[in-house]
Amino acid sequence: VPQGLPIRTPMCRQVHRRFSLWPALLAGFALAAGGLAAPAQAAGLCTAPWLHDGTRLRLDGNGKTPMIVEFTLHDINRDIVDGCEIGLHIHAKSGLVALGGRPIETVQDHRLMVDEAGVVTRVVSTNGRVFAQSEHADLVGTVSTAISGMFLYGAGLAPEAEMLPGDSYDSSFDFDVVSPRLGIAIGHLHAAHARVDVSEREIGPPQTIPTLAGPQACRPIRYTRTATLGVLQLGNETIEPAPTVAHVTDWYCPALSVVVRQEVEQHGETQVINVVDLQR
């Protein structure tokens, strides 16, 4: 990548506007992968029945930030004491309806290191590779994420359960900003301390809802999710976006061992994310 290129402030501002939801998606990737594939006490993730090569989960979200996200598991390694390794490939398309234009398309490849030796499970992805394309700029770089807490609702969700503890997700990312027209780096985007906090979760009684497998008795799990990106270094500019707060409901179906729907309320708008395909 060419070094010493001048940073054009107008371009950086344009990149910031266009990618305003991108860092939050990065910081929350583990939330989607963990919460929608099912969060739990130590021991459970590495022995989950759906954890094998070829498992695929596809999500479809509506609202002002429509998205299609597909997770694929590969190269599972259980030959590790008190843990396992998981290859995770993510392909996503998302965008802001108000901006129009080409959606943001991202490809992520992570190697998840799962440690189940402690009281809570810990999952770490170091320098996961990311490539993102949008109409005005591409991002090429890495993201690292550390997650501690629950990862399988099934293991901690007894029939009489009414509450579950919260979780935290810490991320950092480092990207070159590339001009699609010129094919060269025009800037750099760095965040050292992005964080997602999930409050204590309230569990409701089972309700029958439509799912990809037909009507199922599923339990609503409600909580507040706060995403903080910290200080972003965008070229020569320093940006500190305000934290974003969302009220989330996960619909977990015990018979399927998966969250089939997630409802996210933010700024008076509700986005519904459904599992539309599950192969395991």
What are the language-model segments listed below?
Residues V1-R18:
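N-terminal secretory signal peptides that target proteins for export/translocation
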Residues R8-P10, L21, L25, L73, ...:
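N-terminal compositionally biased, intrinsically disordered segments and leader/signal-like regions
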Residues F19-L21, L26, L157, G204:
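Hydrophobic alpha-helical context, especially transmembrane and signal-peptide helices
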Residues P23-G35:
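Bacterial N-terminal signal peptides
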Residues A37-A42:
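Boundary at the C-terminal end of the N-terminal hydrophobic targeting segment
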Residues A43-N127, A132-H136, P180-R280:
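Acidic, serine/threonine-rich low-complexity disordered tracts
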Residues V123-H193:
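Extracellular-facing segments of soluble proteins and assemblies that are Gly/Ser/Thr-biased and enriched
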